[in-house]
Amino acid sequence: YLYSARSVGLMHTLPIRREGLFLTNFLSGFAMTLIPYAVTGLLCVIVSLCGGAFDARGLAVTVLAVLGESFFYFSSATFVCFITGNAFAMPALYALLHFLAVLLDWLISSFAQGFIFGFSTYYTGVVEWLSPTVYLVNNVRCARQYVEVQQTFPDGTPYTSRLLTSADLESFWLIGVYALVGLALAALALILY
């Protein structure tokens, strides 16, 4: 409703403070993004229980990771909405803010490669932390440990298979950092509101 003057006038004549309107709309929008995750998570729990592979720790890590990343991206989208005030400019600015640092790094590095002797890289990754999507994809990963097990085929031929013994999420704390940044962006959006 913030993109139309008539809607803004109507909503702000209601006897609700601005903070109440912001919080209500923010939480309802965030809840709508979480509904598909809840359905998918419930189906995964049912399938893992039926298969005898349910892991409560893995489920908790997955839920926290999804909540943290979703909160960051939703908060940054809300902040960009309040900066632009235009429904058509919002997606462009959102994508630009999330990938501008990496694009500039690539552009400057590829430009410098033609002028600086010995500079032979197209991407340095120095400012990668300013691009949340690229940084999380490159730094948060699953560390798996396997054990080799000797088995035999029904005809008696031996073979070696790898059995997964543990899987841990490396650099999980980065998701928490970005969730805190999302909290700061939500607070800035509230101030702009």
State what each model feature region is:
Residues 1-14, 22, 26:
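Transmembrane helix boundary and interhelical loop/hinge segments in multi-pass membrane proteins
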